[in-house]
Amino acid sequence: LLTDTRYGCSVPESSLDKYDFFSVSQYCNALVDDGKGGQEPRFSLNMLINTRAEVYNVIQEMTAIFRGIAYYGAGSLVLNQDRPTDSSYALGPSNVIDGNFEYSGTAQKARHTVATVAYQNYDTQGDTEYEYVEDHDAVAKYGIINKNIKAIGCYSQGQAHRIGKWTLLSEQNLTETC
């Protein structure tokens, strides 16, 4: 999709950071619990591209599957992914000279407590099914605030559940930025 000159983006291979792709691949292919007593890759994409679309939009949809983003920077296509990592820089009041931190956050109404994730099921020949994910503590505190999510290219109930769980945890815990 990225390098093909006929139907792809015609991005030269020299513009791709193979280490970014390898790192993302390792994280995506790591086996995790599927919720049914087995294991499956953390992220799997089953997608057929059969219509013309803006290449950038297709790439962003595909990278969103693994909580990533692709952008062109420093002469190459760079992949970044939301995943556990070590801190790269500790920012605190001792790092700021003659200034104050300004914080902004999200309103509680914007934070969801349940997610309904639409995915396609292999067992029912690709029919759309829904995985309901609930943050019990948040529901007890704020009530039911639903978020509908369409999991593009997702055929796994376990992956759909992880998508919903990550969305809810992110909205409840990552509410303030500086």
What are the residue ranges of the model-derived segments?
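C-terminal extracytoplasmic interaction modules
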Residues: 1-178
